């Protein structure tokens, strides 16, 4: 999974701003949640609001990628007027679940939870082996190496993945299409959405994603060349340019 280093390529290109990147719960160097806790996207909001208050940030722009973009939508809604701008990088609210699909979604979450007792973290001999495994999942060599320092922990048998495996599980409850549309419509902050042409949503899915995001009242919606991790790769400079022009 991604971690705070996902923004390490963009950060120098956005050096006119104070960029604060966090490892969300269960990712990177952040703690895993307790055994009885969940990783629904709304579970991160109280923690992030607490961080913002602790840092005494009266007003801020919110930037999120992938799952972080879904969380960013909810965070912007919770911040209300304290959110000056919202930037979504190849991410949005998760695919909605129709009412009739809710029981199947719930059952999948229970099956995932039952398998947790047998889970053992993946262990790699070295960083190169980790990178090869990530490349098979669609990462570039560059993006995998960028994430590695906060994705792995050295143990007696090698380098183990540190993220909480529950982050890969199905959520017991997901938003309906109407709920997603309502959250988009309720956003009262200028929003920049950059969807990668070879990202998470491609071809027909990209068209439906754009249609859903068009429900945001003040949304500058663009497609950019590259993959899901374009902001860590060859597309970083162009993406940074879009962000600077938007926030300026």
Regions found by a protein language model. Give the residues of each.
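Active-site loop/oxyanion-hole signature of alpha/beta-hydrolase fold enzymes
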Residues: 20-63, 241
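Catalytic histidine-centered segment of alpha/beta-hydrolase-like enzymes
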Residues: 224-236
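Conserved loop-alpha-helix segment in the C-terminal half of the alpha/beta-hydrolase fold
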Residues: 186-227
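Alpha/beta-hydrolase
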Residues: 123-200
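A catalytic-pocket lid/entrance helix-loop region that shapes and gates access to the active site
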Residues: 89-123
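Conserved hydrolase catalytic core segment
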Residues: 57-102
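Conserved catalytic-core motifs of eukaryotic protein kinase domains, centered on the activation segment
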Residues: 6-8, 30-36, 97-100, 204-205
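Conserved HGGG/HGGXW glycine-rich cap/lid loop of the alpha/beta-hydrolase fold
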Residues: 1-31
């Amino acid at each position: 999974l991604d971690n705070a280093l996902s923004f390490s390529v963009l950060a120098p290109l956005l050096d006119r701003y104070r960029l604060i990147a966090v490892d969300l719960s269960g990712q990177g160097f952040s703690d895993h949640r307790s055994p009885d806790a969940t990783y629904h996207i709304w579970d991160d909001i109280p923690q992030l609001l607490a961080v913002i208050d602790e840092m005494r940030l009266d007003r801020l722009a919110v930037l999120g990628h992938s799952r972080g973009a879904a969380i960013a939508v909810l965070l912007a809604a919770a911040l209300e007027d304290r959110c000056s701008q919202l930037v979504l990088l190849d991410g949005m609210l998760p695919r909605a679940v129709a009412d009739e699909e809710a029981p199947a979604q719930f059952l999948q979450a229970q099956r995932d939870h039952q398998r947790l007792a047998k889970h053992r973290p993946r262990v790699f001999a070295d960083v190169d082996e980790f990178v090869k495994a990530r490349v098979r999942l669609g990462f570039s060599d560059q993006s995998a190496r960028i994430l590695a320092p906060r994705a792995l922990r050295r143990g007696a048998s090698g380098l183990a993945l540190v993220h909480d495996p529950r982050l890969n599980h199905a959520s017991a409850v997901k938003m309906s299409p109407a709920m997603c549309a309502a959250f988009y419509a309720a956003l009262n902050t200028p929003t920049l959405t950059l969807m990668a042409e070879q990202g998470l949503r491609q071809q027909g899915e990209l068209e439906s994603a754009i249609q859903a995001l068009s429900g945001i009242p003040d949304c500058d919606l663009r497609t950019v060349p590259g993959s899901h991790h374009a902001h860590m790769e060859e597309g970083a400079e162009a993406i940074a340019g879009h962000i600077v022009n938007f926030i300026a």
